[in-house]
Amino acid sequence: MANLDLSKYGITGVTEIVHNPSYDVLFAEETKPGLEGFEKGQVTNMGAVNVMTGVYTGRSPKDKFFVKDETSENTVWWTSEEYKNDNKPVDAKCWAAVKDLATKELSNKRLFVVDAFCGANENSRLKLRFIMEVAWQAHFVTNMFIRPTAEELANFGEPDFVIMNASKAKVENYKELGLNSETAVVFNLTEKIQVILNTWYGGEMKKGMFSYMNYLLPLNGMASMHCSANTDKEGKSSAIFFGLSGTGKTTLSTDPKRLLIGDDEHGWDDEGVFNFEGGCYAKVINLDKESEPDIWNAIKRDALLENCTVNAEGEINFADKSVTENTRVSYPIYHIENIVKPVSKGPHAKQVIFLSADAFGVLPPVSILNAEQTKYYFLSGFTAKLAGTERGITEPTPTFSACFGAAFLSLHPTKYGEELVKKMEKTGAKAYLVNTGWNGTGKRISIKDTRGIIDAILDGSIDKAPTKVMPYFDFVVPTELPGVDPKILDPRDTYECACQWEEKAKDLAGRFIKNFAKFTGNEAGKALVAAGPKL
């Protein structure tokens, strides 16, 4: 299969193409003697290889751009003064320059080419071609995307999208090209190419394709979602879990009683819910065997660790965040035992769960949402972190990320809300807002109680529970649930005085109202204001 012609992309003089290498070949290539710098993988005593990604230990949203042309001009949700996002425009001249840099970097070299699928549903999946000069980057995409069978590879044909990773090349004249730095991640929706320059972070390839799926699917009547998903063991219904980083998406969807569809990116079409990916990309900071056995056990040969501290004996220090807090592992999804096989897809979702880690201590541990509230809280995409300030006081900082994934939305957020609710209405799915954060005790809600809440949602007992309505937010909350401490279900009961909750609730309600103003530029957004908090 090494007779691939890369000259049509402008890559010439290639000395050898290693096409869809096996895991054994990848292991040998990324650990072979003589590799230097960030190309070098270190074998750990768990069997997985660890690599370092240099100065970029996460995505670089400031360096993400789309070429503005006839294809994209009226479809992409462009950044604007009043509402900044990561979809920044560049012109044809800039594109020609960055593409030229990438093709020059990749020409006259020995290259890795990985052909893979994005999307587990045959009728909507994309054929991707990744071109790179670094072995472990080929390993990363082999883990993260859907690996074609030998027969599918033989009949792969032309890809739908091409990703050129030229992480060794720098954009020195970035200022005159209208870029942000020497690093650039640029998409051309007409040529269907993504170019990556001067960042080694693996996640740029993963999230790049998520941004593209987020562009295509809603325009074709499918929901595209930043969520994890699982199904019951009988495969009768799915549940989807939306949530920003650190809210428990991966942890809560990995459930011994259920089968995992995927942990991060999914579509929902007329047949059901499907994974975009063939692997998982889990955070491993402070990873502990007891509390996250599935992820722990997935770290073995063929898994790829990023930016972990590993000593000369190959021992991994998961608590060390000296390089970054965003230490990660990618592994093929079959490293997790409880998964949907052979294809990562499931039936229509019956439960849609929005996870928020509310550091303000206001949101109830679980609220049952109506259709309008579903749209409102989906567009709000709220969570909050506790950030240390200079005097050691820990203050909550709110994050509002539209659709629980604003960084990856290529179209206007209301489009994703529309598609999601359309699918929910068609299948009779219900939405729940689950707070995995803090309450009046100053402690985080226990994972035991949160799991009890998720169980009650999934087995339907929450729909039979007695309820009451919370002030300001009009949330319907259960007053008792099996296996859950009843004293936490109304957050007011966790404070010495309900007045303390009221004060915080007014503050948070005001923040929701202020944030939502940015969606009221169109009729769909205006109509939802009434579903939000009221002061």
Swiss-Prot record:
<dbReference type="InterPro" id="IPR015994">
    <property type="entry name" value="PEPCK_ATP_CS"/>
</dbReference>
<dbReference type="Pfam" id="PF01293">
    <property type="entry name" value="PEPCK_ATP"/>
</dbReference>
<feature type="binding site">
    <location>
        <begin position="243"/>
        <end position="251"/>
    </location>
    <ligand>
        <name>ATP</name>
    </ligand>
</feature>
<dbReference type="InterPro" id="IPR001272">
    <property type="entry name" value="PEP_carboxykinase_ATP"/>
</dbReference>
<feature type="binding site">
    <location>
        <position position="264"/>
    </location>
    <ligand>
        <name>Mn(2+)</name>
    </ligand>
</feature>
<feature type="binding site">
    <location>
        <begin position="444"/>
        <end position="445"/>
    </location>
    <ligand>
        <name>ATP</name>
    </ligand>
</feature>
<dbReference type="GO" id="GO:0046872">
    <property type="term" value="F:metal ion binding"/>
</dbReference>
<keyword id="KW-0210">Decarboxylase</keyword>
<keyword id="KW-0547">Nucleotide-binding</keyword>
<dbReference type="GO" id="GO:0005829">
    <property type="term" value="C:cytosol"/>
</dbReference>
<dbReference type="InterPro" id="IPR013035">
    <property type="entry name" value="PEP_carboxykinase_C"/>
</dbReference>
<keyword id="KW-0312">Gluconeogenesis</keyword>
<feature type="binding site">
    <location>
        <position position="450"/>
    </location>
    <ligand>
        <name>ATP</name>
    </ligand>
</feature>
<feature type="binding site">
    <location>
        <position position="207"/>
    </location>
    <ligand>
        <name>ATP</name>
    </ligand>
</feature>
<dbReference type="GO" id="GO:0004612">
    <property type="term" value="F:phosphoenolpyruvate carboxykinase (ATP) activity"/>
</dbReference>
<keyword id="KW-0456">Lyase</keyword>
<dbReference type="InterPro" id="IPR008210">
    <property type="entry name" value="PEP_carboxykinase_N"/>
</dbReference>
<feature type="binding site">
    <location>
        <position position="207"/>
    </location>
    <ligand>
        <name>substrate</name>
    </ligand>
</feature>
<feature type="binding site">
    <location>
        <position position="201"/>
    </location>
    <ligand>
        <name>substrate</name>
    </ligand>
</feature>
<dbReference type="GO" id="GO:0006094">
    <property type="term" value="P:gluconeogenesis"/>
</dbReference>
<feature type="binding site">
    <location>
        <position position="292"/>
    </location>
    <ligand>
        <name>ATP</name>
    </ligand>
</feature>
<comment type="pathway">
    <text>Carbohydrate biosynthesis; gluconeogenesis.</text>
</comment>
<feature type="binding site">
    <location>
        <position position="59"/>
    </location>
    <ligand>
        <name>substrate</name>
    </ligand>
</feature>
<feature type="binding site">
    <location>
        <position position="328"/>
    </location>
    <ligand>
        <name>substrate</name>
    </ligand>
</feature>
<feature type="binding site">
    <location>
        <position position="328"/>
    </location>
    <ligand>
        <name>ATP</name>
    </ligand>
</feature>
<feature type="binding site">
    <location>
        <position position="207"/>
    </location>
    <ligand>
        <name>Mn(2+)</name>
    </ligand>
</feature>
<comment type="function">
    <text>Involved in the gluconeogenesis. Catalyzes the conversion of oxaloacetate (OAA) to phosphoenolpyruvate (PEP) through direct phosphoryl transfer between the nucleoside triphosphate and OAA.</text>
</comment>
<feature type="binding site">
    <location>
        <position position="226"/>
    </location>
    <ligand>
        <name>Mn(2+)</name>
    </ligand>
</feature>
<comment type="similarity">
    <text>Belongs to the phosphoenolpyruvate carboxykinase (ATP) family.</text>
</comment>
<keyword id="KW-0963">Cytoplasm</keyword>
<protein>
    <recommendedName>
        <fullName>Phosphoenolpyruvate carboxykinase (ATP)</fullName>
        <ecNumber>4.1.1.49</ecNumber>
    </recommendedName>
</protein>
<feature type="binding site">
    <location>
        <position position="226"/>
    </location>
    <ligand>
        <name>ATP</name>
    </ligand>
</feature>
<keyword id="KW-0464">Manganese</keyword>
<keyword id="KW-0479">Metal-binding</keyword>
<dbReference type="GO" id="GO:0005524">
    <property type="term" value="F:ATP binding"/>
</dbReference>
<keyword id="KW-0067">ATP-binding</keyword>
